[in-house]
Each structure stands twice: as C-alpha cells, then as structure tokens.
C-alpha cells in the first residue's frame, strides 16, 4: 500500500522509486506529522509551506495540497464551488465543503514550487530497481525454462513416448 508521501508525489507528477521513498518514509522520525512530511518533500525538491487557514476557506488553497484532518492527513486534489475532491488512504472521495470542514483542522501543507522536483539520484535508483525486478523475474523463468528444455531433450530417456504406444 502506498504512503501519503507516494500519493502526494504522484499527484505532483514527481519521479520516485519505491525502495528509496519507502526507506525514507519508514526511517523518518516525524513521518506522522506535517513537519516530517515537509522534510521528506524537501528531499525531493518540493518546496512546501505549512499554513493555518483560520477561516477554513478551501477555495483559497493551491491544489494538490496536504490537509490535516482530525487524526489523519488527506491529499486535497481539487476544490469546486461546493465540493472538495481528496485522496484518503488511496481512495478518492468527494465531499461537500460543509461535511469536510467538520473534520479539517485548518492546517495544510501547500506547494510553493515543484517544477524541478525529483528524487536524488533518481536515474541510478531507477536502474537499480529495474535490475532488482529483473533478477526477481528472470531467475524463476530461467529455472522453468531449463526444466522444460531438459525434459524435451531427454524425452526418449524418460520413456513418456513409450508409454503412449
């Protein structure tokens, strides 16, 4: 299951690798608060600002953004005149402003700049991730292929054809 950090980078269309982002997220001491999310986004070059919107006017926000609800974080994707569309635990939801305002604390993490955002050493990490996936897939395929080739080349020795006669 993807973390909020992965979902947010997806919403921003920022390149990342699964291994690097999960290690960063799991090892971060503040992964469950806005400070930690901000610091992890800094690693990717996403400049963010933590704000408190006192009047809770959702239309004043830049989207996508991270919104703090009571005990959780959601990713605000877009805000219309009457509804807000957001992502919570990987599920997209649309709610009326009034319903969402009951759970939103007014705290948000908004993006200031993300045009050049990317994972540090992204190309190296991507190459390593592809190589790892290839090893994971190639070894079983080679094993199965060698069994099939071995059986085919020794079909007379096994006696399968003699049984069919």
Residue ranges and their predicted role:
Residues 1-4, 9-11, 17, 25-32, ...:
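Noncatalytic regulatory segments and standalone regulatory/sensor domains
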Residues 146-165:
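Phosphate-binding active sites in nucleotide-utilizing proteins
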Residues 2, 30-60:
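Contiguous, structured surface segment used for ligand recognition
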Residues 17-19, 49:
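A local structural micro-motif
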